[in-house]
A protein has these predicted regions:
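Glycine-rich NAD(P)-binding loop of the Rossmann-fold in SDR/ketoreductase-type enzymes
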Residues: 39, 68-83, 119, 123, ...
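NAD(P)-dependent short-chain dehydrogenase/reductase
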Residues: 134-190
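Conserved active-site helix of classical SDR/Rossmann-fold NAD(P)-dependent CH-OH oxidoreductases
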Residues: 3, 81-82, 126, 130-137, ...
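NAD(P)H-binding glycine-rich loop region in Rossmannoid oxidoreductase-like domains
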Residues: 38-76
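Conserved catalytic-core motifs of eukaryotic protein kinase domains, centered on the activation segment
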Residues: 24-26, 64-71, 107-111, 159-160
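Conserved Rossmann-fold NAD(P)-dependent oxidoreductase catalytic core, especially the SDR/UDP-sugar
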Residues: 56, 82-123
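N-terminal Rossmann/SDR dinucleotide-binding element
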Residues: 1-53
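Conserved sequence/active-site signature of Rossmann-fold short-chain dehydrogenase/reductase
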Residues: 39, 104-105, 154-156
């Protein structure tokens, strides 16, 4: 996403803990990288003013990772959300885009899921994502546009490949072991 935005001519500030390394993105005249924790409200108050849009991707990003440390997951995925939205709105942000998850739908019998369906999150990870959606919508106003996306499993080529996602796990097994290991059997992936 960062490289695409830069290619389109946007100025981009990346705010990240950098737990996977600090030299992931190439240097670019329109790219500013700030190492920081989404829970640090004072740092957010310094960084956010002067920007037009926040694309909020910072979270513990799946159920297994979340379950390793539920209190950490809650502090990052839920507790830090309202302060981030309030700081963004008061800091002059015009557009706030939130990356939720398709897991907020829970398990549906219907083949096609749409935004009008009742949310039935099954885990704390997806429940907190649904809670954040509700919080964000309360802040929507004429001068603070909010947008929520609910991506399914995101996979594909990346400079920092994630091997905790099922599609990438299967690809890794196929390439390195010349076999595909099937796990479970009852899961449905959007």
């Amino acid at each position: 996403l960062v490289l695409l935005l830069l290619k389109k001519g946007y100025r981009v500030t990346v705010f990240d803990l950098m737990i996977y390394g600090e030299n992931v993105l190439p240097k670019h005249e329109k790219l500013k990288i700030v190492k920081g924790d989404i829970r640090n409200q004072e740092l957010l108050k310094k960084i956010i003013p002067g920007h037009q849009c926040v694309i909020h991707l910072a979270c513990i990003s799946n159920d297994p990772s979340f379950e390793l440390n539920p209190s950490l997951g809650k502090s990052i995925n839920l507790d830090s959300f309202t302060p981030l939205v309030e700081i963004s709105k008061s800091g002059g942000i015009k557009l706030f885009i939130y990356a939720s998850t398709s897991s907020v739908y829970g398990i549906k019998n219907e083949k096609k899921v749409n935004e009008k369906m009742v949310l039935e999150p099954l885990t704390d990870y997806s429940r907190f994502k649904a809670d954040c959606e509700k919080i964000l919508l309360r802040y929507q106003s004429d001068n603070f546009t909010t947008s929520i996306i609910r991506p399914a499993t995101v996979c594909g080529c990346s400079p920092r490949q994630r091997l905790d996602l099922i599609v990438n796990i299967l690809t890794n097994f196929a390439f390195n072991k010349r076999e595909i290991k099937i796990f479970g059997g009852n899961q449905l992936r959007p």
